[in-house]
Each structure stands twice: as structure tokens, then as C-alpha cells.
Amino acid sequence: MAINDKEQKSHSKKIIIAVIITVFTLWYGFDLNQYASLEQIKTLQQTSGDYIAEHRSLAMLIFFVSYVVITGFSLPGAVLLTLLGGGLFGFGYGLLLISFASSIGATLAFLVSRYLLRDYVQKKFGARLDAINKGVEKEGDFYLFSLRLIPVFPFFLINILMGLTKISTRSFYLVSQVGMLAGTAVYVWAGTKLSEINSLSGIASPSLLSALALLGIFPWVAKRGLALFSQRKRYSRWTKPKSFDRNMIVIGAGAGGLVSAYIAAAVKSKVTLVEKHRMGGDCLNTGCVPSKALIRSAHAVAEIGRSNEFGVDAEIKTINFEKVMGRIQQVIKTIEPHDSIARYSAMGVECLTAEAKIIDPWRVQIDEQVLTTKNIVVATGARPIVPPIPGLTDVPYLTSDTLWQLTEQPARLLVLGGGPIGCEIAQSFARLGSTVTQVEMASQLLGREDADAVAVVQAELLADGVNILLGNKVASFVSEDGQYSAVLANGDSVVFDQVFLALGRQANIRGFGLEALDVAITERGLIEINDYQQTSIPNIYAVGDVSGPYQLTHVAAHQAWFAAVNALFGSVKKFATDYRVIPAVTYTYPELARVGISENEAQQAQLDYQVTKYDIDDLDRAITDSETKGFVKVITAGNSDKILGVTIVASHAGELLAEYTLAMKYKLGLNKVLGTIHPYPTMSEANKYVAGNWKRNNSPEKLLAWVAKFHRYMRKA
């Protein structure tokens, strides 16, 4: 039977570990460590002179291989060998030999560490290592170069630890080769005077170590200097004002813009908020608020439809679509004051309804006036993607911007896209009575979520009458004699009255001056930002959908705090935006909510994790409400109770998720959730019960066996 890759790798690891143990056993068993002393290498230098004179090439080869073996196995004595190399072969040849031998030996140790340990460490500490690996990807070469320049950091430890990161082998070798050169040269030069050296402390004097430490810091100083030079050069195109009219100008009054302006005003800075359309942005006017109002109306219809389950005979006579849409507008109007000019003006924000254009990093034209500002926050949001599908302009299509203007319900609605918006709209219109067809090119709806959670949602969409076509896409649209149809890639066609496009959103990055400033844009068409929400022009910040990485209202508000604080106080202290705990909810029935990683993501990251599940159909409150569909699934790290991620699919899953978001934010494990009193009967008890399942799965079996013996004894007493 063939050995699979996993078994073969395990076998190889055992062989390598056996070799390492053998080498260390021989080294210490035969007391070879006694030769790793200054006196011994002095003796060796004196006794090997004649041999080297006669067999110089062979002696150099033996020395080279010995150095590689000792450094590769992280055995003690590398410093002494470096001195010996200088004493035996002189500065030039000694430096040449040791420079390459030390780099090759270090790389061998690096590779052994990576092969033996990285998988285990990644599984055990994957979530923590993500941030380190991202830092290594950005500046790993600089980190390693600095560490190599400073001999204070143990040579062998650097090799082992860097093997656990994602730095490439090529980079590790090349940076080590260059970075260790200065320190190696010092010790090789000292080795040429080996007979005069009485202790290693004389070589590694405080002044020398300080000099090398300064040399190690030099790359960072140089990098900072280059960054400042580049920044100065970037700003050189414009003239900076001597004083400013505003501390901050915010462009866009969606969630990100409103929070940025609010924080700026709260700390008594002078801030102007510019919005050319409506306060509240997409979320209030065309996104979160109207869609949830629509979902509520659709849910009311569904509740009446199943009223006989509760012993109530009721029927729906008519669905007044115009009233449904009217209620949505009334909901928007009721919430509008929360985001109004009056409210924000009372907070100290100057609110202007106008078009803004960034003239330079410190000047913004707002209609006819030009204001100077210390900082700018771009919060211009995003708009629905309208793809260039042949024939699309010949048919009546809707987006999340235009859907809310409907006064007549489409009898046949075609929904393109299987993401959260597509699923929410498809289910809502199906419940309201439309014949709905949903097309998704992927093999699964809600592609970022686990298949078991999506299956629950998809089953409900199908039960509500949504015709779901997966693994397909529209090739073209046809308009003929007032009839509209979509021709699919597989040749089928779908007849419709309206088509709703839910194919994602693209950032609003044009039309307000960014192009002229050459602000960096990512491949995804987002404004490129750093960890502090700064764009490529440091005093211009970006938040929300225009910069990503998440297009969620609450993330835009979250980013806004960091942008505002960094803009106003960044000269004193800057804060990196924290994305570790980001909750998200899809408001279908049942809702699908998640925070942290999914099970699929844990598998892809090869983490050491556990999955614990609790089915909602076992929950008393769910049974009383006849809301038994779904489950709570928790991903924990290894055998610990540390929560890595939670997926909930259930009625009101978004409300249930808040407990886990808080727990993850403040590093509270499942034991804390289990130890918290949850009121009975509530849906929130599901969180306690899944924690109980985890506890049972991780109970100390050996201890419980002794406890059972104790109780048997007590019954006899």
C-alpha cells in the first residue's frame, strides 16, 4: 500500500529528529563541547599550521563543512570557529569562507525549523501568527537584516524563529549573507590576532556592540529617511498654507463620514462635513435601513402564511406593494433625524450640502469657496456594479440605488448575484408574491460562509419559492415585443419583468480630485490605505466602502474612529485599525451571522481547531416559537476554550452573535460563556448550551474516573 503524503512527511520528520538527537548525543556524549573554548582553538591554530601550509585547499574545505554542520545543527562554538577561521586563513580567505558557511548553515537550521515546527506552530497559534506574517511580508527583510547586524541576538535563535514565519528561503539566505558580514568581519579580524586574545569579552566590548547595534538600527533610520524624502517629494508639487481654516474636512456623510466628523467635533476641532446628496449615505437611504424595512414586511406576510401552525386561521387578502414601499420611506424619514444636518450642527460640525473637490492635500473647493484644512477624510462610499452584459441597457434593471423607487411590484423578478443583498432581496420579493429567479455563478450562495450554514438558508429560500440557479451566469439580455428575457451561459433563458443587479459594489474614487493628486488605488479599485487609514498622501485619510477591506456600515464607523484620531493626534500617537473581531449578518430568514473565522477558513489555514455545534431545534424557546431551524457553531483553538470564530444560522442570529463578539474582543473563552447566567426561556440560551457541549467534549476523562470511584466509596460509607 502506497504511503500518502502526510504519512511520508511524518516519517521524514521522525528521521530528521532522530538525526538531530544522534548528533547532540554524540556531541555531548563524547564531550566534544570541551573543544569549544578559546584555549582549545589557540592550540588548534598552533598545531595545524604545517598541515594547512601543505594542504591548504583541503583544510579550507574541512573547515567550511565543519562550520556548516555546527551552525546547521545549532551546536555551540560558531563564534570560536569564526575566530579560528581568521587565525588559520587570514582575514580575506577567512571572511570569504565563514561568510558563506555561516549563511548556508543558518539556512539549513532555518529549513529544519520550518519543516519540523511551522505546521505545529501555525495550527497552535495561527491567529496570532497572521499579524506577524503580514508584518514579515511587508518588512521581513528589514527585521532580519537588523537582527543580523546586531550580534546581541543569538545566531541560532534567529534561524529557528524565522523558520516559523513566511519569509522566503531565498530572502532569508541573501539577507543573512549581507547582514552578518559586518559582525563576521569583526570576529575574523580579531581571529587574525588570536594569539593576543585572552578572553572573548575583549572582542565583544560594550563600545563595539553599541557600534554594531547602531549599525543594526541604520536600515530603519535609512528607511524612515527615505520615506520622509519621498513624502517631501510627493508634497513638493503643492504649496502648504501657513495656517488652516479647518482641522479636518470630511467628504461624504455616510457612516464613515458621520463618525469621523462627530469625533473631530467631540474633541473640539474645527471640522466641515460635505455631502452632495443626502445625509446618512447609502445605509440610511438605499441600503441597510430600507432593505431591513422590506424584509420586515415580507416576514409579516410569511408569518400570516404559517398562522395555522399557531392555531390561528388567517389569510392574506391582498398585498399592497405601494403601501409596503411607502412604509419603507416612512422608516427612512423616522431615522433621518439621527443623521441630520440639525443634529450634527448641534454637535459642532459644519455641514454643507455641496460638491467637494480636492485641489491639493490642504485645499478643498466646496462649490465656489476654497477652504484650507490640516487633514482630509474621504468617505465617498461605493455604488452598485452594473456589468457590461450585452443587452442590459435594453431591459429594465434595478440596483440597490433604484429599487426603492418602485411603485409596482414586478410579477417576475430576476436577481443576479448570490451574496447577502441578492439573497435578502430574492427572499423578500418571493414572500411578497413575485416569481423570483436567482442566478449565481458560483456553486454556492453566500460563498464566504460554511456550506452547512448556507444549506439552511438556501432551503428556506427554496421553500419561499425562489428558483435558484447555481453555477450559471447571464450571457445576454433580450428585449422583444415588450418581453424581457435573460439568456444564460448554459443556453437556457429566463423571462422576467425586472432584473435586480446584486453583483457587488465599486468604490466612488473619481470626480472629486483624487485623480489629479495621484492617490494610490488598489487592483480592486479601492483607495489604498495603510494600517492607520492613511492614503498615499499621508494627511488624506479614507474610510468605509471607498477603501475597504470590508463593505459594512459598522466597519466604516469603526475605521472612522481611527482615521479621525490619527488625523488629529497622529503626531503624538497613531493607532492601527483593529480588524480582529468583525461581526457580519445576512438578514435572510433564518439569519446567518458570523464573527471570526469560519470552519472552512480554519481548514484552509490548517489550524489546530475544534468544532462544537448546537442545533436550535433542541432549544426550548425556539420550540415554543416554532423557530427551530439552524444551529450555533463555534470554532475553538486546539483543546482550549479560546474562540476563533462563530457561525450562527437561526431566527435573530444577529442578536445572538453579540455575546460572542464581546467575548472574542475581550478574550473570554467558552468557559466564561458557560458560567454566565442566561435568562430562561430565551434564544440566548443557545450560546450557553453550545458552550456546554464543548465542555462535555473536553471533560477530563481520567479525573472523572477517579471522581466516580470517590462517589462509589461515599455510597458505601
Task: Enumerate the predicted regions with their spans.
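Membrane-interfacial helix-loop-helix
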Residues: 3-7, 25-63, 99, 103-159, ...
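A conserved FAD-binding loop/helix module that cradles the flavin
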Residues: 449-456, 537, 543-601, 680-702
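N-terminal Rossmann-like FAD-binding beta1-loop-alpha1 element of flavoenzymes
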Residues: 246-273, 422-431
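Glycine-rich flavin
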Residues: 263-269, 274-409, 442-446, 452-453, ...
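FAD-site-proximal beta/loop scaffold in flavoenzymes
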Residues: 393-410, 493-573, 658-659, 674
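Glycine-rich dinucleotide-binding loop and its adjacent helix/turn
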Residues: 288, 380-435, 439, 464-468, ...
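Flexible, glycine-rich terminal cap/loop adjacent to redox cofactors
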Residues: 251-253, 265-277, 289, 293-300, ...
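A Rossmann-like FAD-binding core segment of flavoenzymes
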Residues: 314-315, 350-353, 357-365, 371, ...
